[in-house]
């Protein structure tokens, strides 16, 4: 089976779907002020045709109602600028392209569009037709749009996914060089970590080059994804998965060879690695770069606001919170796990993930490290 066929979130609206378990809205709380700033700068820059139609893409949009939260925030940001400038700026038509791989569950997004449009009209006064939303399936590591056609590109929690599993993970004798690990984790040897970094560097460089060609001069990108801070101090979601698969091997439920042949194309870069790649590629200026932490159990409660949460061990509803973490991890990785190990292990694996999540929560290290970077395409000399 091709890698792109299993690199997608769990579709549908069931208990293990990404739509039911994503806490994307909580990440957007943290990202929204920077998103607003990007949109405000775009509209104030008087870029070609932007006052008539602002063209935006959400790269790696995933599925479910949460996919449209970014669209909502963009519309609100545009309205905010319009209110500040009053009659100087008419509301432009907003053309939104939702991008993900071909296997993404776009249908669940489309089903929520009628109610979303009605809500926009009620809350923001957007007439039907002033916000146009469509799909642009395909890999964001390849060309998606015509040259110099886009104003703003957004991507949230996608760029840690690589275009392919790095080479060099198997010896000449066909033996795994990354035994006991499923990606470039803390236990991986330096050559494995370098192989993953090299693949990330290649992919991110390609991403920047291709999308710089699609953006107009001084167009913006806002990117957020998991990063590596404090030398793996805080285990992320794939670390929980790795621990739990190892538990199943130790308990005799899985063969060690099956684990050793499972390599996930994910890399969590350091902020320095991100900065160096952007500067080396050369198409963009870094406007903003910051890291932040999000608790494992963010989104456990409907009223959860992780920004107000202290970084202390969680004891309240520990089992329920750990089960929530396991559901989130499963919604992200189930397709690729089931493809390699089979669906039969999923219930046991979820149980082990919950147990490991509870341990990490008790240790006070239950946080996902994330990086957010705002980029502006450098103008051509003729535009300066």
Curated annotation (Swiss-Prot):
Tell me which residues bind theobromine.
Answer: 157, 160-161, 237, 368
Its Gene Ontology molecular function terms? caffeine synthase activity; metal ion binding
Binding locations of S-adenosyl-L-homocysteine: 18, 61, 66, 100-101, 139-140, 156, 158
EC? Answer: 2.1.1.160
| SUPFAM superfamilies the record matches | S-adenosyl-L-methionine-dependent methyltransferases
Recite the UniProt cofactor note for this protein: Binds 1 Mg(2+) ion per subunit.
Entry keyword Magnesium: yes
InterPro entries xrefs: MeTrfase_7 (IPR005299), MeTrfase_capping (IPR042086), SAM-dependent_MTases_sf (IPR029063)
Instruction: Tell me which residues are marked as the site Involved in substrate discrimination.
Output: 154, 266, 328, 343
Please give the tissue specificity annotation from the record for this chain: Highly expressed in developing endosperm and immature fruits (grains). Detected in young leaves and flower buds, but not in mature fruits.
Q: Which Gene3D superfamilies match?
A: Methyltransferase, alpha-helical capping domain, Vaccinia Virus protein VP39
Biological process (GO) annotations held by this record are:
alkaloid metabolic process; methylation
Q: What industrial or biotechnological use does the UniProt record describe for it?
A: Tobacco plants (Nicotiana tabacum cv. Xanthi) expressing CaXMT1, CaMXMT1 and CaDXMT1 accumulate caffeine and become less appetant and toxic for caterpillars cutworms (Spodoptera litura). Caffeine also stimulates endogenous defense mechanisms against other pathogens (e.g. tobacco mosaic virus and Pseudomonas syringae) by triggering the expression of defense-related genes.
Pathway listed for it? Alkaloid biosynthesis
- Which positions does UniProt annotate for Mg(2+) binding? 178, 260, 262-263
Cofactor requirement: Mg(2+)
**Reactions catalysed, as given in the entry:** theobromine + S-adenosyl-L-methionine = caffeine + S-adenosyl-L-homocysteine + H(+); 1,7-dimethylxanthine + S-adenosyl-L-methionine = caffeine + S-adenosyl-L-homocysteine + H(+); 7-methylxanthine + S-adenosyl-L-methionine = theobromine + S-adenosyl-L-homocysteine + H(+)
Family that this chain belongs to: Belongs to the methyltransferase superfamily. Type-7 methyltransferase family.
Specify the protein name: 3,7-dimethylxanthine N-methyltransferase 1
- Native organism is Coffea arabica (Arabian coffee)
């Amino acid at each position: 089976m091709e890698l792109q066929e299993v690199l997608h979130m769990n579709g549908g609206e069931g208990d293990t779907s990404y739509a039911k378990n994503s806490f994307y809205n909580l990440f957007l709380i943290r990202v929204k002020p920077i998103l607003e700033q990007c949109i405000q700068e775009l509209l104030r820059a008087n870029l070609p045709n932007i006052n008539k139609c602002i063209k935006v893409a959400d790269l790696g949009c995933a599925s479910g109602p949460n996919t449209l939260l970014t669209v909502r925030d963009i519309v609100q940001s545009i309205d905010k600028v319009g209110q500040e400038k009053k009659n100087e700026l008419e509301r432009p038509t907003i053309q939104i392209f939702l991008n993900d791989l071909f296997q993404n569950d776009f249908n669940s997004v489309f089903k929520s569009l009628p109610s979303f449009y009605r809500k926009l009209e009620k809350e923001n006064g957007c007439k039907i037709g002033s916000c146009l939303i469509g799909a642009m399936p395909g890999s964001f590591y390849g060309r998606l749009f015509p040259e110099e056609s886009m104003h703003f590109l957004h991507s949230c929690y996608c760029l840690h996914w690589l275009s392919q599993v790095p080479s060099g993970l198997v010896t000449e004798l066909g033996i795994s060089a990354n035994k006991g690990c499923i990606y470039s984790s803390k236990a991986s040897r330096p050559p494995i970590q370098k192989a993953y970094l090299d693949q990330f560097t290649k992919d991110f460089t390609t991403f920047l080059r291709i999308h710089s060609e699609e953006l107009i001069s001084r167009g913006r990108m806002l990117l957020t994804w998991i990063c590596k801070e404090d030398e793996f101090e805080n285990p992320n979601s794939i670390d929980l998965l790795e621990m739990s698969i190892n538990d199943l091997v130790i308990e005799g439920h899985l063969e060690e060879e099956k684990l050793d042949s499972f390599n996930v194309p994910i890399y969590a870069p350091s902020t320095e690695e991100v900065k160096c790649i952007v500067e080396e590629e050369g198409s963009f200026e870094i406007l903003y770069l910051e890291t932040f932490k999000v608790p494992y159990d963010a989104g456990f409660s409907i009223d959860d606001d992780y920004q107000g949460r202290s970084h202390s061990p969680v004891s309240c509803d520990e089992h329920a919170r750990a089960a929530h973490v396991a559901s989130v991890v499963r919604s992200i990785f189930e397709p690729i796990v089931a493809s390699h190990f089979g669906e039969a292990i999923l219930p046991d694996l979820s149980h082990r993930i919950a147990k490991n999540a509870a341990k990490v929560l008790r240790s006070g290290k239950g946080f996902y490290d994330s990086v957010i970077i705002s980029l502006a395409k450098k103008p051509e000399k003729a535009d300066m």
